[in-house]
């Protein structure tokens, strides 16, 4: 009887503990955002924009400017990733020429981050549109410096 009571209490405790544990992803994303921001600011970058968990985003880039883009995604199930930034243009040759792919940067808990860097050349006009593609969906953080 004591053994049965002990196992019942142990089982109830385990079930209670399992029901209390939620996803740590949002906390890990917040931690990654803080570390990313600190690193970017130390290297002279300024904050431009943050996109919530999304598969696509767009920014307008200025000439002669460096951009630093981070994709932070849930790596719980180790998904295959496809992140990139490319010039939004109907000309596929130009789009291919001006496409950048990131490299893996770090993992904080279940949040994994990829970093992408590019510098815009001198061009006529004020800005050019750049599309950011994230598969799987990711939080996207963009920083810039002249």
Residue spans for each PLM region:
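Sec-dependent N-terminal signal peptides
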Residues: 4-13
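Solvent-exposed serine/threonine-rich low-complexity stretches and specific carbohydrate-binding patches
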Residues: 96-106
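Non-catalytic extracellular/lumenal accessory regions of secreted precursors
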Residues: 20-55
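Beta-sandwich interaction modules
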Residues: 59, 104-124
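Short, surface-exposed beta-strand/strand-loop-strand elements in extracellular ectodomains
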Residues: 77-94
């Amino acid at each position: 009887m004591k053994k049965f009571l002990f196992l019942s209490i142990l089982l109830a405790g385990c079930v209670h503990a399992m029901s209390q544990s939620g996803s740590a992803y949002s906390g890990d994303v917040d931690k990654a955002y803080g570390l990313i921001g600190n690193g970017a600011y130390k290297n002279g970058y300024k904050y431009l924009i943050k996109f919530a968990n999304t598969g696509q985003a767009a920014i307008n880039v200025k000439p002669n400017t460096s951009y630093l883009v981070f994709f932070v995604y849930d790596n719980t199930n180790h998904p295959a990733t496809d992140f990139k930034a490319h010039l939004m243009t109907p000309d596929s040759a130009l789009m291919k020429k001006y496409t950048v792919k990131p490299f893996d940067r770090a993992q904080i808990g279940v949040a994994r981050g990829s970093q992408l860097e590019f510098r815009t050349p001198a061009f006529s006009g004020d800005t050019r549109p750049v599309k950011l593609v994230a598969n799987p969906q990711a939080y996207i953080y963009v920083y810039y410096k002249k």
